[in-house]
Amino acid sequence: MFTGTSISDDSSPEERARSVEARVRMIERGGYGFGDRATALLGSSASADTWALVQQTLRATNPTGFMQAVRFIAEAEMPPLATGLTMPLLIVQGEEDRVTSAATNAELLAAALPHARLVMLAGCGHLPEVELSSSVNDLIVAHLS
C-alpha cells in the first residue's frame, strides 16, 4: 500500500540535489518551521486532535532523519522500481494533498501498474493514514480480504 505517493519529478538530478541542499540550509538556520508545516500536510477534514498530533510530531522530528528521507525520495526513481511489483497494490491519496499532487504522482503510478487500485479521499491531505485512519484501515482490510 502506498499513501501520499511521490514518484519523483521531471527535474534533473542536479536540480533535485539543489532543492535538497536548499532544505538542508533552511533547517541548519532553524527556518524550516517543522511545527508550522501541518498546514501543508493536512486537508480540510482533519480534526483538531489530528492537527495537534501532527504539529507535536513535526516539532519532535529529527532534522537529520527528515533530511535522509528527503534525499532518498529525491534520488529514488519510483516507476522503474514499482513496475516490478506484480501483487495487487492499493494506492491511497488525499484529494487535498498539497505535497504530492495526484495528477503527477499517484495517478501516474496507478496507470503504470496493472494491479493497482487508486482511492482518492475527499477532504484529506498528505497524511491519509493519520487524517482518516479508520477509513484507511477499512480500505486495507478490504484490500487484503
Model-identified regions with their sequence ranges:
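Catalytic active-site module of serine/aspartate enzymes centered on a nucleophile-bearing elbow/loop
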Residues: P114-S145
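Acidic beta-to-alpha connecting loop that harbors the catalytic carboxylate
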Residues: E95-R98, G123-G125
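Flexible "cap/lid" loop of the alpha/beta hydrolase fold
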Residues: M1-R29
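Short alpha-helix in the alpha/beta-hydrolase fold that links the catalytic acid
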Residues: R71, M87, A102-A111
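Amphipathic alpha-helical segment in the mid-to-C-terminal domain
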Residues: P63, A102, E129-S133
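Short, surface-exposed alpha-helical segments at coil->helix boundaries
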Residues: A17, W51-A52, A102-E107
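Conserved alpha/beta-hydrolase catalytic His-Asp/Glu region
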Residues: S11-E15, R29-G84
